Amino acid sequence: ATPAYMSITGTKQGLITAGAFTADSVGNTYQEGFEDQVMVQGFDPAVIIPTGPVYGQ
């Protein structure tokens, strides 16, 4: 399978995935140019909307 790469940026946190995919963190699967991203090997596009009094619904 062909891997996908994703970066995550928070509104207040900035680049959350900074330094996530380095040779030190992933070993021999390291790919130059993807240092601030994470490798996505699977994805479930489900969206969960919390409901109930705690969430104002």
Curated annotation (Swiss-Prot):
The keyword Secreted applies. It is found in: Secreted. InterPro entries: Hcp1-lik_sf, T6SS_Hcp. One of its GO terms (cellular component) is extracellular region. Keywords: Secreted. Transmembrane segments: none annotated. It comes from the Bacteria. Belongs to the hcp1 family. Homodimer. First appears in the mid-log phase. Present at highest concentration in the late-log early-stationary phase, before gradually diminishing. Significant amounts are still present after 30 hours. This is Major exported protein. It comes from Pseudomonas syringae pv. ribicola.
